[in-house]
Amino acid sequence: MSYYCRTVKFTFISEFAKKSFISQLNSSVNAIDFERGLIQRIFFDTSENQIVQIFVWPDKSSADKRMKEIGDDLLQNLRESNVKIERFEGIISEFSINPKDFSNKEN
């Protein structure tokens, strides 16, 4: 199986705009994305007004289908709100997870 990764970097005009976006996205998208096949979603902050999102899908067609449902319109609306958007995507060449149990952080 070849997993597909879509990474999006957003640069907002302010920290408030970034936090508003994250709040709205988390409440409306999480469950639906997982129902549509999303395997993993990671967000990380690179600055007070910037965030990077990483989405791992089972394949490109699943990622593209979900993008057509919500992503294209969302990205257009964000661009119109002066949000800088950079997208990177492709087939994942390696997907490894550490087998160590991290539930006990004292290990």
Regions found by a protein language model. Give the residues of each.
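Short S/T/G/P-rich N-terminal loop/turn motif that feeds into the first structured element of a domain
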Residues: 1-51, 58-72, 79-107
